[in-house]
Amino acid sequence: HNVLVRKAEGIETAGSLNILFSDKTGTITKGELEVVDFFTADGTSISANELRHHGKVKGLLDLAIGKNTQAMFDVYHKVIGGNATDQALLKFIGEETFCMLDGNDGCKVSAHQGFNSSNKFSQARIESIGKTFYKGAPERLLAKATKYLDGDGQIKEIDQKALNQKIDSLAAKAMRVLAFGYSEKELVKNQINDDLVIIGLVAIRDDVRPSAKDAIRQVQEAGIQVVMITGDRLETAVAIAKDAGLLKNESDRALSSAQLNQMSDEEVKAILPQIRVIARALPTDKSRMVRLCQEMNLVVGMTGDGVNDSPALKRADVGFAMGSGTEAAKEAGKIVILDDNFSSIKDAIWYGRTIYHNILKFCKFQLVINVTAVVVSAVAPFLGIEEPLKVTHLLFVNLVMDGLGAMMLGNEPALSKYMKEAPRRRD
C-alpha cells in the first residue's frame, strides 16, 4: 500500500486522527505540472511554437527560466532535480535551449538566490549582460514592476488592474500563475529591485488525482477533517479544493497565510472546524496549526516533504513524510508515503483503525479465556472437584489456544466499516 511505517505507534495513532493537514502538489494533485499558457503583461497569449517569432521576449524568458532553476536535463533527456515547478518550466523551454544556455560561457550566473516559501521568488544575476532575472509569485513581482515587455519587445506601462483580472480568471480555473522579470540593478538578497520589467507570465496546470477525490471522501466519512495546505494563491487553491471535494458547504472556510496570521490563537480555534484550505502557507503556519489543534485535544496528522516541514512533522501526532521528500522530513515523520498519494494516507488511517480493532478483539478473547479458567478453578472445589484444571491444562490454554487465537485475530483483514466510525479524541 506504499506506506512505510518508521515508528510502530504511528500507524495505530493514524487510525485515531481527528484532523489531517495535507499538502496539495503531488499528494492531492498528480504532481505532473504542465505549462499550458504563456502571456505578456497585456494579456496577449503566445504559444510555445510562436515564441520563436518574438526574439527579445523569448531570449529573456529563456534566461529567466534556464539560468534561474535547480532542475536540469540528464543524459537520458529527462528532467531531474529542482521541484515540480522548475521541471515543468524547463520542459517548456526545451532541452535544446537549456543545453545551449548551459554551454554558453557568456551567460554564466554570478549570483543566485533560490526560491523559498517566505520570499515567494528566486533570482539570478548574470553580470556579463548586466541583468538580474526573477521568477516567482505574480503579486511579489507586480508589487515592484511598473513596466513590461510586449510581444514585439517594446517596454510599456503595465495596466495592473487588467493583468490581475487575467491572473484571477486563470486561478479560478485551478491554474497556478508564475511571473518572470528582469532588472538592470545588482542582485540584492531577499529583495526585488524597483526597476523590474515583466517579461511575461505562465499558467501551470496540475490536475487533481482521481484516486485522491475518492480517498478524501472516505477520510471525511471517517469523521476526519481534511485541510489542504498549499503555496498557491487563494483563488487557485479554492478552485482545486472544490474539484477535490474539500469545499462543499457555504460554511467551509479558505484562508490565506496572511489572513491566518492576522488572527489570534483564540480566533483561529473558533473557526478551526470550518477551515478547509490554507493558501500561500508558510512552514510556520503548519507548526502553529498543529499546536492549536493539540491545545483543543485533537489528534493531528501533518504531511510534508521539505526540511522546513520537519518541525511540524515532528510535533504532529502523526507526521506523514513524502517518499520524494528530503531525508530530514523522513526522519521527522513517523510514516513515509512512498508514492506521495493521498490514497495511501487513507490506507494508513484504515489499517491504523484495523490494528486497534484487532487488538481489541484479542483483549476480549483473552479476557473470556482467562476469566473462564479462573471461575472454573475457583468454583470447582466447592462442587467436589479438587483440581479441575491441571498445570498442563493451563499451559495448553495459554500457549496453544491463546497463541493461535492471537495470530488469527491479529491478522484479521481490514473491514470497510471501520472507515465509517467516528474517530477517538485525545481526551
Show where each model-derived region lies.
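Short, intrinsically disordered, charge-balanced linker/junction segments flanking boundaries
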Residues: R424-D427
